[in-house]
Structure formats: structure tokens, C-alpha cells
């Protein structure tokens, strides 16, 4: 993104290498690249609201050290994901990054039905450990976008996650089968188009 697009600001979660179990300060390369391209790096804080286009982006949670408390080392970093809600003209878009079930449950406990969203970006590329039933019950998404590569080594999206999304009644859009997907919100109607398929109403 930074190499190919003009990015004014980069929003990142607080990073605690010791709490996360990581031995290296992995964000340093990213920060150096941001500086090289003149991109401002902003450390997110829960509850902060940023103006974005005609709407606002709210940081719901991300990076709290207590979310690192897990036996799965890979989940340490995943649970540091920023969870954000974009709102504009009756449209709501929820993104939870790679957050695992523990971080999702914290969201549910803190915000409940205020997490309702028109469009939800499936957690962790459609992993079985994200997009839990508890979260979907409060989000009640009209449509879900899954970002994952074709025939990826991780098996994303997982069949269990797909079943939960289907049971939630959401239209499912996948980059592995559809390529780049563009969502449009107009006249209170969400539509989706991809490089490989015709426009489809969600």
C-alpha cells in the first residue's frame, strides 16, 4: 500500500513486543517505509474518532496488553489488531483485522448491538477462530467481505467460518474467487462489483 498509493496517515495499534511474545520490533521496517513516503504514523487509542471523507472512523479497540494473554503465540499479535467502525450516511462498516475469538468477545461485551454494521470484513481472512457466532449475532451484517488469496496455504476461508456467515444471513464476497471487490453505498443500497463478475446487489 505505502509503495503504490499516496497514504497521508497510517493508523497502528500500540505495540508491546514483550507482552505479545515477539522478540523483534517488527513494525520498525513499516515505520521506516512510512517515513520514506512521507506518511504520518499515528498510534491509535480506543474511542478516538477520525474524520474520513464524508464519514467518521472510530477506533473500538486494539493493542490492549490483556488481549495477549493466550497460549497460542500466533494469537498474541492477532489480538492486537485494530478494530474500527466507519460510519457515513446510514452506512456502517466494521473491521476487526486478525482479531481472534477472545478479542471479538471483548468487543461484544463492551459494545453489544452498537456493533451493528451494513458491511463486515470477516476476521482473520475467514479463519475458523474469528467471525464468531457471538459477534455475528450483534453485528447482523447485510454483507461480508473475505480477503484471502486463492488456494492459500492456510485454507482460508474455513468451512466453519463460512457456515457461520451463511447462518447469519449475510451475502458473502470473497477476493479469492472474485478478485478485487468494490462496494458502493448509494440511496441506502449496498452493491458490490468485482473484476471477475457483474455487479451484484447485496
Model-derived features with residue positions:
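Non-globular, low-confidence helical/coil segments that flank catalytic cores
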Residues: 1-202
